[in-house]
């Protein structure tokens, strides 16, 4: 279980949200909504261990992730706005790089197949369209073999077919006792089975 307890985060000395609480059990799918600048990205970065909270804590299996990051990091994968790919490398070289880090080279073929990357596998990443770049970045979800997926606006720059593909992968991960947390501006019909957390409910200054 991933749990936030009385979580408050700030950016540039500005408090974004205060006393946020939720629990994500295995098989959870959670959508964090709110307008730009409301703190969605900061929350998901905090959940990933990249942004220590002002107060409160994030716990995974009962342990504070900031006290014990080495045991938490292998359990999760975070996909942010930046795709974390090298323009000078081909798609296959980027994926192989991630697989070496996670020691999951056996998952490369499956990731390429599931995300239908074969047409661009030998093309340099910097030559791809925005949609293909995002799709390649999302291959890290499968390469990581992680229980927790944290994705900032996963459907950005994707066409409807690719969005459906990603939704199917999210559902499969959830059904396999995974936890999936994503951000978006609002809920949609396709995300109706996600639990929604509106970050604006916690946009209050610390006192």
Positions of predicted regions on the chain:
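Catalytic Walker B motif of ABC-type/P-loop ATPase nucleotide-binding domains
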Residues: 149-153
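Conserved ABC ATPase signature
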Residues: 97, 124-133
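Conserved ABC ATPase "signature" region
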Residues: 105-121
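Hydrophobic anchor residue at the start of the ABC signature
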Residues: 138, 177
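Helix-to-loop junction immediately C-terminal to a conserved catalytic motif
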Residues: 48
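Q-loop/switch helix immediately C-terminal to the Walker
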Residues: 82, 87-103
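Conserved ABC transporter NBD signature motif
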Residues: 53-67, 71-72
């Amino acid at each position: 279980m991933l749990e936030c307890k009385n979580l408050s985060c700030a950016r540039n000395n500005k408090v974004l949200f205060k006393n946020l609480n939720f629990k994500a059990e295995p098989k959870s799918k959670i959508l964090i909504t709110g307008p730009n600048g409301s703190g969605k990205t900061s929350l998901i970065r905090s959940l990933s261990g990249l942004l220590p909270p002002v107060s409160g804590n994030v716990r995974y299996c009962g342990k504070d992730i900031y006290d014990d990051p080495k045991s938490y990091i292998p359990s999760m994968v975070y996909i942010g706005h930046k795709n974390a790919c090298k323009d000078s490398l081909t798609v296959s070289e980027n994926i192989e790089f991630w697989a070496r880090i996670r020691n999951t080279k056996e998952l490369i073929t499956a990731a390429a197949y599931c995300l239908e990357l074969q047409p661009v596998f030998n093309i340099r990443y910097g030559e791809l369209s925005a949609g293909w770049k995002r799709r390649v970045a999302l291959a890290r979800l499968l390469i990581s073999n992680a229980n927790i997926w944290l994705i900032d606006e996963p459907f950005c720059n994707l066409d409807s077919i690719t969005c459906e593909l990603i939704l199917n992968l999210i559902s499969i991960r959830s059904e396999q006792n995974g936890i999936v947390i994503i951000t978006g501006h609002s809920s949609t019909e396709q995300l109706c089975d996600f639990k929604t957390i509106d970050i604006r409910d916690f946009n209050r200054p610390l006192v």
